[in-house]
């Protein structure tokens, strides 16, 4: 697998017409130290002891910005509360006023996002229920059985369908676009569901005007992670994102928590749908077996029962439970543990193993109706543990589904949850090691507003720690953030985002495929090493060089005509466009050393005047540590 990945990366370098691998390694080793440690001091001369900066009140409103310049504050907001600036965004925010822009992002329903919705119409799976997805994209074994063929025959038919789909792609004459459409056409069956969901996720990050909403959707999915490749979850994740996460990104935390707890995707992923009172379950199984024997006419006298008579099958439809394959089904602690450790209280939240068991018992009966046919949440009182349960010192004895709902509300409003969620917010939006003063302020707001997500975010954004010099460019972009921000910076037109989603996966963050419930790490140490940096440089060079399938990049429009023949001018222009001219001297020296590379200036047969390879320069700048940070 590693060899195959290396070959893919090298092909990307060759396709981009980039520097030699040795040159790239030299760049990587030069900028790796800058990536590994926060670096907020740039060539603009910002020092830790700098005097307070006074910004126009009309621009900043009540935002407590005293250490960042106007341009820095705008870039900071666009990078932290969104996926970075597109050309023209900085001036647009400046004209609007930063506080007004922030307030607008905190209220996404006030923002017209119809252009994005039009773009998403091409994805046929996004608005389908889990049942319809199962009907339209059934598992291979089920589809083969339905068609009356063997699994091998069905596989052969699918391969032919993929070939037919590729042949039916209407070629546009644009090699990049045609290749991407052909790649997408090959994805048939259930894999199409996750492919379209992934492409739509990237479309939202790149093209949505509701940038903070897109960030929060990603944050909450990562927080309440499910693994799409676990059995039936592949058909349930679309609904999980659309119906559970997205509508609640800035509402009450307890509403989001309960919605995820009732989601078939979460119930299936953490096995709570199988959790049952062992004694009640065995009793129910015995009753089902006895009922089945009666229905089959297995009596001492051998006489089959008559329809509509006592002991015989009813003449109308019934809701008889299906036979369970696992006769030893009992209490499952997975969700009871993770809802405390990962979703609410945190690992040091003050709960015990007995609390985990009690929470699992409170949530027995929270299950899924036919997960591989028509997955819907329902509460099955027959397998619920009845009786008094004590979780975190609180007794639950209402009975039925209410016990679970009350227990989840208790966890959602616990002081440890306020601290844990506030820490997660601050780590994502401010720094890997956020100030305790900020966390305490956010946690206090969390408790006073009963977990109002929008209010907690506003408290964070309107805190001086958010706008501090230490927080500026202190976060390393995860692969998803890097890919989205690069597409935005290049003002790229990406009709088919599949190649971009593939790059996110190649750099270590495949969408919806994080197997452990922890989700992907938000800390730099996970993403910073020489191998990862080479992959990031490779991506930037391939994308900026116009060689990435499914993308259109017009660097001439971005750079302007003046950079055409002077590599130094082109570099300065790239630094200004992509980094607002804010770059450390060590980075500038490293980049300028590459300007002597023969690939930088090239002549064509029809034009002896050497032209700057703008794609290579742009790619190197986009691979710089300042752009890799947000």
Regions found by a protein language model. Name each.
Residues 215, 240-241, 265-266, 573, ...:
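Surface-exposed interaction patches
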Residues 1-15:
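N-terminal secretory signal peptides that target proteins for export/translocation
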Residues 105, 259-260, 620-621:
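Conserved catalytic core of Hanks-type protein kinase domains
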Residues 19-33:
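Bacterial N-terminal signal peptides
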Residues 51-52, 56-59, 177-186, 191, ...:
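Active-site substrate-binding loop specific to GH73 endo-beta-N-acetylglucosaminidase modules
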Residues 39-61, 67-68, 75, 79-89, ...:
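Flexible, low-complexity segments enriched for small/polar residues
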Residues 34-38:
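Boundary at the C-terminal end of the N-terminal hydrophobic targeting segment
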